[in-house]
Design a protein with these regions (language model features):
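Ferredoxin-type iron-sulfur electron-transfer modules in oxidoreductases and energy-metabolism complexes
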Residues: 151-171, 186-271
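Iron-sulfur-associated redox domains of electron-transfer enzymes in respiratory
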Residues: 2-173, 181-186, 190
Length: 271
């Protein structure tokens, strides 16, 4: 669900700035991957000295979560280039789940990562229907209440035929822009199945349906951290987050596993 309301929360955080200042000045980290305000725009930035921290923001500009980026995905690239250095990174609840999952897949070394957590406001938690809208440790914000999965429940209430028709209708809107894959912090395969001609032929719009989205849903098993960036990136407004929430519910029911809620590795990592 995309938030529509006006949101007037300040985007600066003294607590966050103080924490990152301590980490940089003490030499605990080489840099801090967070969000930077620049002439009214907010984007990812690697802060390497204290003087830059006047531009450090939490990302809530006009509404909660309106300036979110897959920081963990950027962190993987930074860590590959500087494997001996330790970096801090700004995390919300979903980002922290992503880090924990990436550790189990050996994409990041936990000894070289210092997460700095902020809690999501209740408005954002409600819109995301998030089960854990905060990291384990927060330097800013109040821990919001976990939310019911109302959207998934409403679709579950439909008949099999109506559910099938709903998803087929949604999938036909796809223009195969790969936005969902490219923004996903948990897509890190060296060779992408949904980009392979052997499985899904390129150059066809709309893509072969429903194989494209069902293949991606299978690959989200044991990986999806429910960050919702796929929803935000989709120009066709396909409710991809709802699809992956349902997949996550099935895996939780059958295997008692949700990515990032523990240090446990996915029981389905063979996929």
């Amino acid at each position: 669900t995309k938030l529509k309301s006006r949101y007037d929360k300040k985007i600066m955080s003294d607590n966050l700035k103080s924490k990152v200042t301590d980490l940089l000045s003490s030499g605990q980290i080489k840099g801090f991957l967070g969000l930077r305000s620049n002439e009214g725009h907010i984007g990812p930035y690697l802060f390497t000295n204290e003087a830059e921290l006047d531009h450090l923001v939490i990302g809530d500009w006009q509404r909660p979560g309106d300036s979110r980026y897959p920081l963990n995905k950027f962190l993987i690239q930074i860590a590959c280039k500087y494997p001996e250095d330790t970096f801090g990174v700004l995390v919300r609840g979903c980002d922290e789940r992503g880090l924990k999952t990436l550790y189990t897949w050996n994409q990041l070394n936990p000894a070289k990562v210092v997460p700095v957590g902020i809690a999501c406001p209740q408005e954002l938690a409600d819109a995301c229907e998030c089960l854990k809208p905060y990291p384990d440790e927060c330097v800013d914000g109040q821990k919001a209440t976990a939310c019911e999965q109302k959207t998934v429940s409403s679709i579950d209430a439909l008949s099999n035929a109506d559910r099938f028709a709903l998803w087929i209708k949604e999938f036909t809107k796809c223009i195969k822009c790969y936005g969902c894959r490219d923004v996903c912090p948990m897509c890190f395969c060296n060779e992408c199945s949904v980009g392979s001609d052997d499985l899904i032929h390129t150059g066809h719009i709309p893509p072969e349906m429903p194989i494209f989205h069902l293949t991606r849903a299978v690959h989200m098993i044991g990986r999806c951290i429910d960050c919702g960036l796929c929803n935000e990136a989709c120009p066709a407004d396909i409710p991809l987050r709802t699809l992956y929430k349902k997949v996550a519910d099935i895996i939780d029911k059958e295997f008692q596993y949700r990515p990032g809620y523990s240090d446990q590795k996915s029981p389905l990592n063979v996929l």
